[in-house]
Amino acid sequence: MNKNQEEDILGDNHIATSAVTPLRADAFQMSETEKITEIETHVRAILHTLGMDLTDDSLKGTPKRVAKMFVKEIFGGLLPERKPSMSTFDNSYHYGEMLVEKNIVVYSTCEHHLLPIVGRAHVGYISNGKVLGLSKMNRIVEYYAKRPQVQERLTMQIVQEMQRALGTEDVACIIDAKHLCVNSRGIEDIDSSTVTAEFGGKFKDPEVRKEFLEYIKLDTRFH
């Protein structure tokens, strides 16, 4: 098997090589403006190679639009300064049960084909004395989703970040998402979705895990 075949198999199997986002040591040396300028040049070259007429009104602004979108939006989670503040509060009311934030929208990008991953995340924890503001869980999901990603890694990163912030292992996350690299190319299966889960601490107990899953299944639509 040659190197190209190995790379194709790795990409089509959606394998994560590590729970850490693979970044070079010099990843943050360029400014946002410098990155946008560099990416714009490469996008322009790609479209030119594909035979597109970049003088057309519809296309002439595309290289810059794509570059800005990459740096400021869909890959904005690569920038450390975008990481949300993870301040916690004392659990002064001594709430001792599970807290679950479910149906958090996930918009990410498959790092193997740079196509969208779209789905929902369900995140829960059991307080050991500290609590997070509810919106913080949504922001954690968004931050780690906004980068080239693998769903398994994303699931683990969300759990690990919450464990660090809360000082407890008792955190869980389930993500159910569609991968356009499966839906729109390759096998072209438009119906399948991928489910990943990471359970820490008390969530490894089958009864606690069952309770978490029951909360997720509750119908809480209000419109």
Predicted regions and their residues:
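A domain-level signal for the structural core that forms small-molecule/cofactor-binding pockets
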Residues: 1-223
